[in-house]
Every structure is written in C-alpha cells, then in structure tokens.
Amino acid sequence: METLFSGIQPSGIPTIGNYIGALKQFVDVQNDYDCYFCIVDQHAITMPQDRLKLRKQTRQLAAIYLASGIDPDKATLFIQSEVPAHVQAGWMLTTIASVGELERMTQYKDKAQKAVEGIPAGLLTYPPLMAADIVLYNTNIVPVGDDQKQHIELTRNLVDRFNSRYNDVLVKPEIRMPKVGGRVMSLQDPTRKMSKSDDNAKNFISLLDEPNVAAKKIKSAVTDSDGIIKFDRDNKPGITNLISIYAGLTDMPIKDIEAKYEGEGYGKFKGDLAEIVKAFLVEFQEKYESFYNSDKLDDILDQGRDKAHKASFKTVKKMEKAMGLGRKR
C-alpha cells in the first residue's frame, strides 16, 4: 500500500473550502493509502504565535480531522512537535539546500514582505522542514493545492540531491492536485481562494461558524446579474463557486445541479444552499464537540504520535548513517 502524507497548520479554524478541497477527500482515500495526517505546529511558529491560542487551535484541528471522518484505525493523526524526527530530518535537509533556492520560494517572498520586525530565519528554512515531514514516512503521494506545489517540487529536488550525494535512502514523492471543483473561492471575491486568515469574515465560512451566520453569508455571496445557474469559472465565478460548495456538500454532480435549478433564480438556489450549509455545520459541530472535550482525542493523538515516531525514527537513522552522523554501532 502506498503512503500519503498531508500537513495542516493550526493557525486558524479550517473553512468549508478546506473541508471540500482537502478534509473530505482525505476521508475518501484513507481506505486506499497508508495515510499520515500531521498537525504542523512547528511550521506555525515561523510567524509569531500566542502559545495558549496555538495549543487550543492544535486541539481544535485534531477534533476537526476526526469530525470530518478520519478514522484513527485506518489513518495516523499526530502533532508534528511531538515527533522529534521532524526537526532532526529538517536540519539534515537544510544542510543540502541552498539559500538561493529557498529565497526563490513564493511564500517566503510574500511573508517576508509582511514581516514587521525583521524576517524570521524560520521562514527561509520552512521548506526543508516541510520536505522532512514528507520523506520521513516514505511518502509516495502528497495532495496539495497550487500554493504548495513549488514546495513539493523543492522536496523532490532535495530527495534527488540527498540520494545522489549519499545513498538512495529517501523516497521521491509525487504531487496530487485537488480534483476539479474541489477549489472553493471567497464568497465576496470569487477570483480569490477562500482563506481562513481573511480579514473579512464575510469572505469565508469557518467549520465552527454559527450555522445561522453561515447561512446568511451564503445568501449575501457575490453572483452576477443574469440569474442563470451554470458552472462557468471564467465568466460566472460567483455562482460557479456556490455550485462547487453545493456539489461538495451533497456529492451531487454539477450537471445535475444545473438541471435541477434550470429556470430558477439565484434567490431559490442560494436559499437551498444556505439550508444545506446550515444542516452540514450543525451535524459537523456536534461531532466536533464530542471529540474536542473528550479523553478519547488524547488517546488518538498518543496512538498517532507513537506510530509516527516508530516510522520516522527508522528514516532518521538511515539518513544519519548515510551522512556519517553519530557513532557507528
């Protein structure tokens, strides 16, 4: 069975877009791959974080994974900082990366421009740590969006460099892009991806939004003026985005949605979608609360940590041996 790895930062509550584009798809593939789902809190601290808020959001994200349908008997859910091999392997890969290629990373450039008090070194060395996250588990498949594709390409380059310089120790991962329709956009500006860090709360629906508030956001979402329910990302981005949300939450094919609402106006469609979103959030949040406030969540994270540690320790030891680190025993 091939291995799939995915990491999400606990830097905010995931949106309904994160659910449709990632979490829901993870549930679908956990029967087909040996899945490792990592809460990458060490990546989060490359930017300033409040320690209490970070811990809370880490636990919230773990509960959200489980509420989404991740089965701890099929997949490994764990927290990055609880598995020491990540920073160990991250440092080893940092030593074979060049400053030039790290400075070319688009996310580094974007975040460095926003840095108020100097550029944290962790921003620059973020990609080798991300590469370590992936290679530690002999990962074959990494599901990512366009914004992370450049980092995975760098990971593949670092794997080639390590294997060429030392030994064929590391597995070279393949990129898997989200399926068509899996990308959910901003509700008020459907030319931009929906983001949990957006300053305008009307642009996104958090998985922990109050359901009635979320329904209002759907009803006030931007559309066009012709009133035709048709999937056309180039010419009708607003209604196309709402159709994507409808399809993502109901599993109804886009063509069937178009046929169902043929001759109907946007008011009817938005009203129905608002109720679908509301019902989804009510059920989702009930599951979330049952995990967040339970000892079972800690048991699952302990189990995931132990499995991840066992698997990653083997890879780190192979890397250390290949590089000549430590004593020969």
UniProtKB/Swiss-Prot annotation:
<protein>
    <recommendedName>
        <fullName>Tryptophan--tRNA ligase</fullName>
        <ecNumber>6.1.1.2</ecNumber>
    </recommendedName>
</protein>
<feature type="binding site">
    <location>
        <position position="184"/>
    </location>
    <ligand>
        <name>ATP</name>
    </ligand>
</feature>
<dbReference type="InterPro" id="IPR002306">
    <property type="entry name" value="Trp-tRNA-ligase"/>
</dbReference>
<feature type="binding site">
    <location>
        <begin position="9"/>
        <end position="11"/>
    </location>
    <ligand>
        <name>ATP</name>
    </ligand>
</feature>
<dbReference type="InterPro" id="IPR001412">
    <property type="entry name" value="aa-tRNA-synth_I_CS"/>
</dbReference>
<dbReference type="InterPro" id="IPR024109">
    <property type="entry name" value="Trp-tRNA-ligase_bac-type"/>
</dbReference>
<keyword id="KW-0067">ATP-binding</keyword>
<keyword id="KW-0547">Nucleotide-binding</keyword>
<comment type="function">
    <text>Catalyzes the attachment of tryptophan to tRNA(Trp).</text>
</comment>
<feature type="short sequence motif" description="'HIGH' region">
    <location>
        <begin position="10"/>
        <end position="18"/>
    </location>
</feature>
<keyword id="KW-0030">Aminoacyl-tRNA synthetase</keyword>
<dbReference type="InterPro" id="IPR014729">
    <property type="entry name" value="Rossmann-like_a/b/a_fold"/>
</dbReference>
<comment type="similarity">
    <text>Belongs to the class-I aminoacyl-tRNA synthetase family.</text>
</comment>
<dbReference type="GO" id="GO:0005829">
    <property type="term" value="C:cytosol"/>
</dbReference>
<feature type="binding site">
    <location>
        <position position="133"/>
    </location>
    <ligand>
        <name>L-tryptophan</name>
    </ligand>
</feature>
<dbReference type="GO" id="GO:0006436">
    <property type="term" value="P:tryptophanyl-tRNA aminoacylation"/>
</dbReference>
<feature type="binding site">
    <location>
        <begin position="145"/>
        <end position="147"/>
    </location>
    <ligand>
        <name>ATP</name>
    </ligand>
</feature>
<keyword id="KW-0963">Cytoplasm</keyword>
<feature type="binding site">
    <location>
        <begin position="17"/>
        <end position="18"/>
    </location>
    <ligand>
        <name>ATP</name>
    </ligand>
</feature>
<comment type="subunit">
    <text>Homodimer.</text>
</comment>
<feature type="short sequence motif" description="'KMSKS' region">
    <location>
        <begin position="193"/>
        <end position="197"/>
    </location>
</feature>
<dbReference type="InterPro" id="IPR002305">
    <property type="entry name" value="aa-tRNA-synth_Ic"/>
</dbReference>
<dbReference type="GO" id="GO:0004830">
    <property type="term" value="F:tryptophan-tRNA ligase activity"/>
</dbReference>
<dbReference type="GO" id="GO:0005524">
    <property type="term" value="F:ATP binding"/>
</dbReference>
<keyword id="KW-0436">Ligase</keyword>
<dbReference type="Pfam" id="PF00579">
    <property type="entry name" value="tRNA-synt_1b"/>
</dbReference>
<dbReference type="InterPro" id="IPR050203">
    <property type="entry name" value="Trp-tRNA_synthetase"/>
</dbReference>
<keyword id="KW-0648">Protein biosynthesis</keyword>
<feature type="binding site">
    <location>
        <begin position="193"/>
        <end position="197"/>
    </location>
    <ligand>
        <name>ATP</name>
    </ligand>
</feature>
